[in-house]
Amino acid sequence: MKKIMGVILFICFAVLLVGCGNKNKYHATVYTNSNDILTEDFLFNNKIKKVEYNVKNEDGTYQKDENGNYKTVMDNDAPEERTFIVKDNTTLSTMVNSNKVTVDFETQIVVVNLFFSYFSRDLFISSIKFKDGNAKFKIYDKTKRGYKDSSGPHARYAFIIMDKLDIEEATFSYTTKEVW
């Protein structure tokens, strides 16, 4: 009986240790395209390589060709990703749709990464490492085995609100985790 109680106590202690880890020590939250945070104009003015963008008229409507199809433009000289470190409301207001996010820049910072993707899955933060002004973000999405959810190429973004750090440079790596 003492052995059984010892094993149960050990398992409880092990679960407690694992559960108390501070996986999100910077209180980071990631938002994606589905949250409709960034404006179309901001995305159009910060193109990503391999992505087609609809062309707008001055009145905000989309241009069409003689066949009625939307005119698109692709910038193959654009970078494959873009990263923005936002430290004030003035900069943020040029990027976001109004009332989509609230950021307290006294205690928080925003990091945005635009990238090319075939998928529109939700994104999750695996880890954030910060050293000497450099932040390294590991981001993942989830897919089900055998589930086909790809789409046409499009620009995606990871919009991260987190504790204020003195970030000068940010790098991102993306992976997919397969779930059952």
Where are these regions (language model features)?
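Exposed, flexible binding/inhibitory loops of compact, secreted disulfide-stabilized domains
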Residues: 20-180
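Sec-dependent N-terminal signal peptides of Gram-positive bacterial secreted proteins and lipoproteins
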Residues: 1-24
